[in-house]
């Protein structure tokens, strides 16, 4: 058999089937497009469902692909086995109603055994078939020439996922030889059994039946072929290595981790698990981010976060205690570049996302692990189970994935009370749902509304005033003929200029009435049957149904809403231009006073980025772009480059808001006629709403001017406060005052040092001999963490051969610092001293072997912590 690189196997596979008349289907993104049934693309056939179910017709009925895929149903096994992966490539050839069993089997045999392709030894190949698949048996036995002893009948060789296409399958196995086990049926040492000797390299599925609702099977009119060959597994066979992780797909990653950890792979089993976890997970994370996913607290983003945190946790067994996963991205990109160039193209962005996420997790990991260790100790002393409420707190407060808690607990033979955990999760979801609903004042989805079928036409795109008829009236949840002054009512108009809250845009306000009554409209939502449902308070007169009324939208508020909505589109485009195409809308609120825009991005924007975005939006406003709005088929809209919001559902006909060339979006909202009407755009804040999501709030027009006016007034007050007359003098004056403050602070520090020195007396008298070490462990009086470091420097200069441990009460906080002479760090480490000491004062810390720092929130425990650390050194 040929020894081939993984990239060579992939290319040979594609070339072989192209020669056999197959069309190459490019690998689709891991994030499914137009398929809500999948979290990730998880197989080679997943992207071809459009052909198998008849929605689309391929250019050729024969298809070949190499599809990247993610499966996360057994993450806990990754690292502990030879071939479990979360990210993998599936090579596949498919026939949509064209060839069937005969050709599929002959193609597979030729590719595997021909010297032009894989060159496998025929005598090392075995196959399994379904017991009743006599046709497959005949082809293997009579046509291929495989002797009966190498054709194994297995009942499980039938591909069936319930209702829909199904059929028998045949699997091809490669015999790796006696070194991987002696033949023994009692130990499943046979093709199809659980063993390391006979490896499945290819699965051919013959989709020839339809699984009916009544659990009967009928022949399909068009029979299909669906095959799958795992590239990682085939590479391990071709390269003659024991596991997939020793192939050229993983070893360059593992080699880099060896350098970082200063440890070798295949020396220590515990370390090997960590190497494999890291190598697997970084591939998944890099590819998923390249395809548009970002770490988050739910959905596919949560999967990424879980994988990254699992890898970080395992890296600690290799003594890697700092962010490093991001450094592996370039290696992944280089390995995969021949077929997947997008990872290299987006490498800088991927690294920034991963590094940001690593840093965030490292901040809470030590504290989370300390809490988990306490929970484990508590469980061991009671019922060997972690309380679900405690596990939820660990997840909710410290960002600890519940799966990580379960995994670490299982290693100690401790279970987690998942029923209580899920109950806590449900309560959290309920609270979130109720919070959302409480912000929506009109949630009356009663039978009354469902039974109202009166048509209502929205005319608000064309006008803000309209003469119409009040057709339906609701009071206290009931349809009524009339209502009285002061009552809050819901009503429907035959035609309405009032926009109903939708797409982030708030509803219009205004009045509805005639000479006999007036209703102040306070809210408008969509009724179950599509009408605009108005809410309002009767100002005067008796309201009766079927009355002719004047419906008038508050024009000033409407104009401000239009400005903010159009500015939101410009903001979205500017963010993509400045930050990158990964930016997608994650939510918005368009009001008359302001706009709020949530978007996907891995970290806080810099001030320069904020300034660039603000400038670009204003430039497009000042250009005076005509805003063209038209309805068209959705395919036509996409062809012209219209941006569809991720996760939104659109009909066949869509409304396109065109501010070309800068912004083209699908949108049902109300906009200005020309961007110049917006006047001015000013960002007032940029913040985070959750991992991977940022929020910008901004003003336009008059609100932006008033905001700038307020800033100017505050600046004038500062000018008066620092007693200067010119605007240009303010900065220099503040610098002068800061310099004076700095000098005064230095004088204060010097006085504090002198006081501390007087109180401490001769530090030689404070030093103790403990277990062969000279140790100074004491509390010092300082005013901040900087001063405790300066005090440490003073003590070190006088006692260079002593271990020095200082603690200070800073009010509600504790500051800790420790140093160890470098020549003693092979016996005791400063980082270990602080890690053991900090929890006693309610905190955490760490650092280098020769110097470490920490802190806490329980100054009353300082004396106890100092006594503890002396005992700790005594026991070394």
UniProtKB/Swiss-Prot annotation:
Catalysed reaction, written as an equation: tRNA(Ala) + L-alanine + ATP = L-alanyl-tRNA(Ala) + AMP + diphosphate
**Keyword annotations of the record:** Aminoacyl-tRNA synthetase, ATP-binding, Cytoplasm, Ligase, Metal-binding, Nucleotide-binding, Protein biosynthesis, RNA-binding, tRNA-binding, Zinc
Please give one Gene Ontology molecular function term for this protein. Answer: catalytic activity, acting on a protein
Cystine bridges: none
EC number(s) recorded for this UniProt protein: 6.1.1.7
Could you tell me which SUPFAM superfamilies the record lists for this protein? Class II aaRS and biotin synthetases, Putative anticodon-binding domain of alanyl-tRNA synthetase (AlaRS), ThrRS/AlaRS common domain, Translation proteins
Required cofactor(s): Zn(2+)
Bound cofactor: record note: Binds 1 zinc ion per subunit.
**Its domain of life?**
Bacteria
- Gene Ontology biological process terms in this record: alanyl-tRNA aminoacylation
User: Does the entry feature the keyword RNA-binding, yes or no?
Assistant: yes
Cellular component terms (Gene Ontology): cytosol
- Binding positions for Zn(2+) per the UniProt entry: 565, 569, 667, 671
The enzyme's first-digit EC class, named in words, is ligase
Compartment list: Cytoplasm
What NCBIfam families would the database entry show?
Answer: alaS
Q: What does this protein do?
A: Catalyzes the attachment of alanine to tRNA(Ala) in a two-step reaction: alanine is first activated by ATP to form Ala-AMP and then transferred to the acceptor end of tRNA(Ala). Also edits incorrectly charged Ser-tRNA(Ala) and Gly-tRNA(Ala) via its editing domain.
State the family it belongs to: Belongs to the class-II aminoacyl-tRNA synthetase family.
Write out the domain note: Consists of three domains; the N-terminal catalytic domain, the editing domain and the C-terminal C-Ala domain. The editing domain removes incorrectly charged amino acids, while the C-Ala domain, along with tRNA(Ala), serves as a bridge to cooperatively bring together the editing and aminoacylation centers thus stimulating deacylation of misacylated tRNAs.
Protein name per Swiss-Prot or TrEMBL:
Alanine--tRNA ligase
Q: What is the lineage of its organism?
A: Bacteria, Bacillati, Bacillota, Bacilli, Bacillales
What's the gene?
A: alaS
């Amino acid at each position: 058999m040929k020894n081939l690189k993984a990239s060579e196997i992939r290319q040979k596979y594609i070339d072989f089937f192209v020669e056999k008349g197959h069309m190459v289907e490019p690998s689709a993104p891991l994030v499914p497009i137009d398929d809500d049934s999948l979290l990730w693309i998880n197989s080679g056939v997943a992207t071809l469902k459009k052909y198998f179910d008849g929605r689309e017709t391929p250019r050729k009925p024969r298809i070949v692909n190499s599809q990247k895929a993610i499966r996360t149903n057994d993450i806990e096994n990754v690292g502990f086995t030879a071939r479990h992966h979360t990210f993998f490539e599936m090579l596949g050839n498919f026939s949509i109603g064209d060839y069937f069993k005969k050709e599929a089997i002959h193609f597979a045999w030729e590719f595997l055994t021909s010297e032009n392709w894989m060159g496998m030894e025929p005598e090392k190949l075995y196959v399994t078939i379904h017991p009743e698949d006599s046709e497959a048996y005949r082809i293997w036995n009579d046509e291929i020439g495989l002797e009966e002893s190498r054709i194994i009948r297995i009942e499980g060789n039938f591909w069936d996922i319930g209702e829909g296409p199904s059929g028998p399958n045949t699997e091809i196995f490669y015999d790796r030889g006696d070194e991987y086990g002696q033949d023994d049926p009692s130990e499943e040492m046979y093709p199809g059994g659980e063993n390391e000797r006979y490896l499945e390299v290819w699965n051919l599925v013959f989709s020839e039946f339809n699984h009916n609702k009544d659990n009967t099977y009928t022949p399909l009119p068009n029979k299909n072929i669906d095959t799958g060959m795992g590239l990682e597994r085939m590479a391990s066979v071709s390269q003659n290595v024991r596991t997939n992780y020793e192939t050229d797909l993983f070893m360059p990653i593992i080699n880099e981790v060896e350098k970082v950890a200063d440890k070798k792979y295949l020396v220590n089993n515990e370390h090997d698990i960590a190497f494999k976890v890291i190598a697997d997970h970084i591939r998944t994370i890099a590819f998923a981010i390249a395809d548009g996913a970002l770490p988050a607290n739910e959905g596919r983003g949560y999967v990424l976060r879980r994988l990254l945190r699992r890898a970080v946790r395992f890296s600690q067994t290799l003594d890697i205690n700092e962010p490093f996963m991001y450094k592996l991205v370039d290696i992944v990109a280089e390995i995969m570049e021949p077929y997947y160039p997008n990872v290299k193209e987006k490498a800088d962005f991927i690294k920034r996302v991963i590094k940001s996420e690593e840093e965030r997790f490292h901040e809470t990991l030590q504290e989370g692990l300390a809490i988990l260790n306490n929970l484990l100790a508590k469980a061991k002393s009671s019922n060997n189970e972690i309380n679900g409420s405690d596990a939820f707190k660990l997840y909710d407060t410290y960002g600890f994935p519940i799966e990580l808690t379960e995994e670490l607990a299982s290693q100690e033979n401790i279970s987690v009370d998942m029923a209580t955990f899920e109950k806590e999760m449900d309560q959290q979801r309920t609270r979130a749902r109720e919070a959302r609903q409480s912000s929506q004042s009109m949630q009356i989805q009663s039978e009354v509304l469902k039974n109202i079928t009166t048509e209502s036409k929205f005319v608000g795109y064309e006008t803000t005033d309209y003469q119409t008829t009040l057709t339906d009236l609701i009071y206290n949840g009931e349809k009524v003929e009339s209502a009285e002054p002061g009552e809050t009512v819901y009503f429907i108009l035959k035609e309405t200029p009032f926009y109903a809250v939708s797409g982030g845009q708030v509803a219009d306000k205004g009045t509805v009435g005639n000479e006999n009554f007036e209703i102040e409209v306070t809210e408008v939502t969509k009724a179950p049957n599509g009408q605009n449902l108005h809410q309002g308070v009767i100002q005067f007169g008796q309201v009766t149904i079927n009355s002719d009324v004047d419906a008038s939208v508050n024009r000033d508020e409407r104009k401000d809403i239009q400005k903010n909505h159009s500015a939101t589109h410009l903001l979205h485009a500017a963010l993509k231009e400045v930050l990158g195409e990964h930016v997608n809308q994650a939510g918005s609120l368009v009001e008359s006073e302001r706009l709020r825009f949530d978007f996907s991005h891995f970290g806080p924007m810099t001030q320069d980025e904020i300034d660039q975005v603000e400038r670009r939006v204003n430039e497009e406003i000042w250009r005076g772009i005509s805003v063209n709005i038209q309805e068209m088929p959705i395919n036509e809209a996409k062809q012209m480059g219209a941006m569809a919001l991720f996760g939104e559902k659109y009909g066949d006909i869509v409304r396109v808001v065109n501010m070309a060339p800068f912004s083209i979006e699908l949108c049902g909202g109300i906009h200005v006629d020309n961007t110049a009407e917006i006047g001015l755009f000013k960002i007032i804040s940029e913040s985070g709403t959750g991992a991977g999501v940022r929020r910008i709030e901004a003003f336009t027009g008059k609100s932006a001017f008033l905001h700038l006016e307020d800033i100017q007034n505050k600046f004038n007050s500062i000018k008066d406060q620092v007693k200067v007359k010119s605007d240009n003098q303010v900065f220099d004056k503040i610098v002068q005052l800061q310099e004076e403050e700095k000098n005064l602070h230095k004088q204060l520090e010097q006085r504090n040092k002198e006081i501390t020195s007087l109180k401490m007396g001769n530090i030689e008298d404070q030093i103790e001999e403990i277990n062969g070490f000279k140790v100074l462990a004491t509390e010092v009086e300082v005013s901040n963490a900087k001063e405790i470091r300066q005090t440490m420097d003073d003590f070190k200069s006088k006692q260079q051969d002593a271990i020095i441990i200082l603690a200070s009460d800073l009010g509600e906080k504790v500051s800790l610092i420790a140093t160890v002479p470098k020549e003693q760090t092979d016996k005791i480490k400063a980082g270990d001293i602080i890690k053991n000491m900090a929890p006693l004062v309610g905190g955490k810390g760490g650092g280098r072997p020769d110097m470490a720092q920490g802190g806490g929130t329980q100054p009353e425990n300082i004396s106890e912590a100092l006594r503890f650390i002396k005992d700790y050194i005594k026991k070394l």
